[in-house]
Structure formats: C-alpha cells, structure tokens
C-alpha cells in the first residue's frame, strides 16, 4: 500500500527465492510445484516483514494459505534463516541478493517454485514536498552504488 502524502522513488528490483543447503535432503530437486509446498519444512521471516508479505501474496495467487504450510520456525533476520538452513533439512524463502555468496560458494542452491515468481521493488520514501537537499544526495549516492548490489 502507498500513502498519498509520501513520494515513492524506485530504487532496486529484488526477487525472493526458495533456497536449501546443498547437504539437505531437499537439494535433490531443481524445481517444485507450488502444490508441493505444504509437504516441505520451511523457515520464514517473521510476521510484518516485507519478505513474508511478498511470499504470502504469491501463495494466495496459487490458492495456498500460509497456515497450510509446514513452517517450522519464523525468524527475525535473513542471516538467522541462513544459519538455520545450514543445520536442517528445511527450505527458506529469502532475497536472491542475500544468498549470493552462499550460492557462488556452493553452500546453498535455489529450488525454483514453478510458476510462482516472487518479485518486489525497493523504493526511497520521502514526504511530499521535501525531496531536495541531503535526501537527494543520498539517493544519487545509493543509486550509483546499487550497481554492485
């Protein structure tokens, strides 16, 4: 949702992905169907997180509810999810950007959920009419350095 008294400026596109540790029993599949999700142990971000909101909306598009899933744990950070995945046979839903190093190192692998893209956009948010000055300088700086994200 967006508030009318705020200005939203697009910053980064992001994608949520399902990941498993390469030593997990779940690492044998390259892809699953959304209907398989209730049978897979999951670790997810906590209520109120944007990550969980995007995942939940994607589930609803496939007539699935979060309450129908086998969620073992809700955690407060992506880092804690990654640590949990290292020691369990669970699947996590995280930003592709957050697991880049683990994917390159071969510690995690992405399991595609067929037909269930989970895209989101990060925005700069400012009060309408207060778009100048330091906030503009920061937006230029962040935009320039976002190429490395």
What is the predicted role of each segment?
Residues 41-63, 132-133, 149:
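Secondary-structure junction motif
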Residues 1-16, 20, 109:
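Short beta-strand-centered segments that line the small-molecule binding cleft or hinge
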Residues 21, 45-46, 94-95:
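Thr-Gly-centered strand-to-loop micro-motif
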Residues 7-10, 33-35, 63, 100, ...:
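Short secondary-structure boundary/capping segments
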Residues 111-149:
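A late-sequence structural motif
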Residues 9, 35, 82-83, 136:
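Alpha-helical segments flanking ligand/cofactor-binding loops in enzyme cores
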Residues 56-60, 64-109:
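Hydrophobic hinge/microswitch elements
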Residues 1, 22, 96-98:
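Short secondary-structure boundary segments
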């Amino acid at each position: 949702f967006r508030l009318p008294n705020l200005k939203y400026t697009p910053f980064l596109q992001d994608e949520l992905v399902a990941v498993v540790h390469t030593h997990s029993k779940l690492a044998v599949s390259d892809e699953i169907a959304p209907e398989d999700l209730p049978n897979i142990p999951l670790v997810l971000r906590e209520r109120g997180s944007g990550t969980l909101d995007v995942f939940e909306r994607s589930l609803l598009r496939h007539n699935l509810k979060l309450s129908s899933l086998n969620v073992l744990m809700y955690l407060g950070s992506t880092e804690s999810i990654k640590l949990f995945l290292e020691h369990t046979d669970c699947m996590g839903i995280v930003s592709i950007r957050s697991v880049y190093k683990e994917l390159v190192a071969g510690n995690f692998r992405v399991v595609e959920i067929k037909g269930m893209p989970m895209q989101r956009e990060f925005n700069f948010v400012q009060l309408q009419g207060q778009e100048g000055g330091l906030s503009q300088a920061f937006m230029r700086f962040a935009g320039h350095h976002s190429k490395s994200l």
